[in-house]
UniProtKB/Swiss-Prot annotation:
Cellular component GO terms, alphabetical: ribonucleoprotein complex; ribosome
Database matches in PANTHER family: 50S RIBOSOMAL PROTEIN L31, CHLOROPLASTIC (PTHR33280), LARGE RIBOSOMAL SUBUNIT PROTEIN BL31A (PTHR33280:SF6)
Keyword Kinase assigned: no
The protein's name: Large ribosomal subunit protein bL31
GO MF annotation, one: structural constituent of ribosome
SUPFAM superfamilies assigned to the protein according to its UniProt record, in alphabetical order: L28p-like
Quaternary structure and interacting proteins, as annotated: Part of the 50S ribosomal subunit.
Gene: rpmE
Function: Binds the 23S rRNA.
Species of the source: Aeromonas salmonicida (strain A449)
Origin organism lineage: Bacteria, Pseudomonadati, Pseudomonadota, Gammaproteobacteria, Aeromonadales
Length: 71
């Protein structure tokens, strides 16, 4: 590697809107302000809502589930 062409790798702090502070390293060189981090994101906290969009079978049963075939 050539000397003097690579950016400096410095310590920065990433501050979340929930108050969590994460110390990390970056070549950007300035502190970050985050909207969401692993301490407040619903996926990581377990407060995630699972949405079932349903498939073709569910759609069919919703439309024709109560009907019976005549012989």
């Amino acid at each position: 590697m050539k000397a003097g062409i690579h950016p400096e790798y410095v310590a920065i702090t990433a501050k979340c809107s929930c108050g969590n502070v994460i110390n990390t390293f970056s070549t950007m060189g300035k502190d970050l302000n985050l909207d969401v981090c692993s301490a407040c994101h619903p996926f990581y906290t377990g407060k995630q809502k699972e949405v079932s969009s349903g498939g073709r079978v569910d759609k069919f049963n919703k439309r024709f589930g109560g009907l019976t075939a005549k012989k």
